């Protein structure tokens, strides 16, 4: 009985995840929307222009960017859409 109870507790903890992850978009501007699971507070949307036009990149973490690149970091599910 104790083993069953322990197993249920472990499964509950793994399934609930206690909000430490979030869902972020991770596609380039010309691609269909896709998502990935990221660490809390770690979605970004990076925008810049080149000979192809305006490029948008989305993903996890908040990278350092070069001058001329706009970065937007956020901390809720699918906030970088």
From Swiss-Prot:
Where does this protein chiefly localize? secreted
Family annotation (Gene3D superfamilies)? CD59 (2.10.60.10)
The protein's UniProt keywords, in alphabetical order, are: Acetylcholine receptor inhibiting toxin, Disulfide bond, Neurotoxin, Postsynaptic neurotoxin, Secreted, Signal, Toxin
| GO MF | acetylcholine receptor inhibitor activity; toxin activity
The keyword Thylakoid is assigned to this record = no
Task: Spell out the disulfide connections.
Answer: 24-43, 38-60, 62-73, 74-79
The residues forming the signal peptide are 1-21
Alphabetized PROSITE patterns for the sequence: SNAKE_TOXIN
Tell me where on the tree of life, at the top rank, the source sits.
Answer: Eukaryota
| InterPro entries, per the entry | Snake_3FTx (IPR003571), Snake_toxin-like_sf (IPR045860), Snake_toxin_con_site (IPR018354), Toxin_cobra-type (IPR054131)
What compartments host this protein? Secreted
Gene Ontology, cellular component aspect: extracellular region
In which tissues or organs does this protein occur?
Answer: Expressed by the venom gland.
Q: Which SUPFAM superfamilies match?
A: Snake toxin-like (SSF57302)
Its job: Binds to muscle nicotinic acetylcholine receptor (nAChR) and inhibit acetylcholine from binding to the receptor, thereby impairing neuromuscular transmission.
Spell out the family assignment given in the record's similarity comment: Belongs to the three-finger toxin family. Short-chain subfamily. Type I alpha-neurotoxin sub-subfamily.
- The entry's protein name is Three-finger toxin MALT0051C
Q: Give the originating organism.
A: Micrurus altirostris
């Amino acid at each position: 009985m104790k083993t069953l109870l322990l197993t249920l507790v472990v499964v509950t903890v793994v399934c609930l995840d206690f909000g430490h992850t979030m869902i972020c978009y991770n596609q380039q501007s010309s691609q269909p929307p896709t998502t990935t699971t990221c660490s809390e507070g770690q979605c970004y949307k990076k925008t810049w222009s080149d000979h192809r036009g305006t490029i948008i990149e989305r993903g996890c973490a908040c990278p350092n960017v070069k001058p001329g690149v706009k970065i937007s970091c956020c901390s809720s599910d699918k906030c970088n859409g």
